[in-house]
């Protein structure tokens, strides 16, 4: 991408031992998939240890996390549908991977990920349709983003 970069950024994912070694050997960043803050912390720690062994570094702010969110509550059909998807795909509890509530709940989850070592985030809105997803995204931009910037200072 422009401007021309000496090294193409390569963010890798995965939490297995081979994925951790690959990230340490080749990555310029790491992006969690559906891991919780409690699951992310040991992976980031293991990557950092593997980086020492590889005599490499990854910028301290090149560790990412992801979760789905909904300004609303767990009883809403859109949230129930998302929870069923996570349950079916992961065969694990969906609650730690979804935040349904208000700005405070979303910010609390971001803060948990920051405490675990993540500093970049992919937040996926849960919605019934395109209009709903746009509305959820707008709320995130207006209500959460300004506060997240404060968390990172």
Residue ranges and their predicted role:
Residues 1-153:
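Active-site-adjacent structural elements that line small-molecule/cofactor binding pockets in enzymes
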């Amino acid at each position: 991408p422009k401007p021309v970069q000496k090294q193409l950024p390569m963010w890798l994912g995965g939490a297995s031992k081979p994925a951790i070694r690959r990230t340490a050997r080749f990555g310029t960043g790491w992006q969690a998939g559906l891991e919780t803050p409690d699951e992310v912390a040991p992976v980031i720690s293991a990557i950092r240890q593997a980086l020492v062994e590889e005599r490499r570094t990854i910028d301290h702010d090149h560790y990412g996390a992801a979760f789905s969110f909904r300004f609303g509550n767990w009883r809403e059909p859109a949230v129930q549908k998302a929870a069923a998807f996570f349950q079916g795909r992961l065969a694990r509890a969906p609650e730690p991977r979804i935040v349904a509530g208000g700005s405070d709940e979303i910010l609390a989850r971001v803060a948990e990920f920051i405490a675990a070592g993540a500093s970049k985030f992919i937040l996926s809105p849960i919605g019934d349709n395109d209009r709903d997803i746009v509305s959820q995204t707008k709320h995130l931009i207006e209500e959460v983003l300004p506060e997240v910037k404060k968390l990172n200072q």
